Amino acid sequence: MERVENTARLVSVYDDLLFDLPKNIEVSWYNLIEILSGEEIFEQRYKVKDERNVVKFLLADDTNSSSMLSSLKMVRENIRTTRDAVPKETWELINELDLYAQQNIKQGINRSERHLFLNTIIEGCQKIIGLFAGAMSRDSGWHFLIMGRYLERADMGTRILDAAVSLMLKSEPEARIQLGQVTWSKVLKSQSAYLDYRRTVRTSINGAKATTFLMNDPCFPRSLAYCLGQIGEAATKLPRAGLITAKVDKLLEFDYPINSSEDLDEDFHNHLNDIQIAIIEINHQITENWFHFRQGDAA
C-alpha cells in the first residue's frame, strides 16, 4: 500500500516539476527509471525513453513488479489472505481502489488528467491506512505492518531526494539557482512536508535545509529519521529483534553534514545509495528473522 502511494507521489511531483520549469531547462523522464534502478527491465520492454513509456512502466506495466498496478494487485492478494487480521472494511476499500486504478489507468498515462488520477490513488491509499490506524489491534500483525510501511517510506523518500539531487547535478551550473527554487519546493510538497517545513525551519526553501529536514527531522512522519525510529520501535515489540534494532541504530547514528546546497553533490548521491542498500539489508534481515526463522538461529 505504501509503495502504491509513493509511486503515485513520485510521478506526480515529477510531472508538476516539469510543468513549472522554465522552457530552457530540459529534464528527462528517464531519470526516474535510473533512480528506481529499473533500467534493465525498462530497456527490455521499451526502445524509446520518453515520458509516455516511463509513466506507463511506473504505473501500469504488469512486467514491472514495482509498478503501481502490480503493487495494487499484491496488496489486494495480501488483504485477501489476511482478511481475519484486518478490519473487514479493508477488503471493500482495496477492491474499489484496484477497480478505479484499472478502469482509469489511461488517465494516469495521459498528461491531461494525470494529476486528478494520481491524487485519487493517493487519497484511496490514505483512507485504507487511516482505517488500519483506527481499527487494528496493536499486536504482532500491526508491528509487522508498521515495519513494512516505514521501510517502504524510507526507501522511496531517499529516492525522491535522489531524483532532485540528480536533476540538479545534470543541469547547467548557471541554471541551478532558478532550478533549485522550483525543485525543492516540489520535493517538499510531494512529501506533504511544505507547511511543516515552513513552520519548523522558518526560513526560505533551499536544497540544504529541505534535505536536512527530510533526512533528520525527528517529528515529521515522512523524514528518514522518523521512519527508521518507527521501524526500530516496532521491532522491539517482537521477539528476537536484536539484529534489526542494531542495524537501525547504526543507520540512525550516521550523520552526513549538509551545510549548503554545494554539499548535495555526487558524494551525497552515493550516501543516499548506501542508505537504500542498508534499508534493503534491514528488509532481508526481517525476512530471515521472522519468516525464515529456524529454532536455534541467532538473532
Predicted regions and their residues:
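Alpha-helical transmembrane segments and their helix-helix packing motifs
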Residues: 1-299
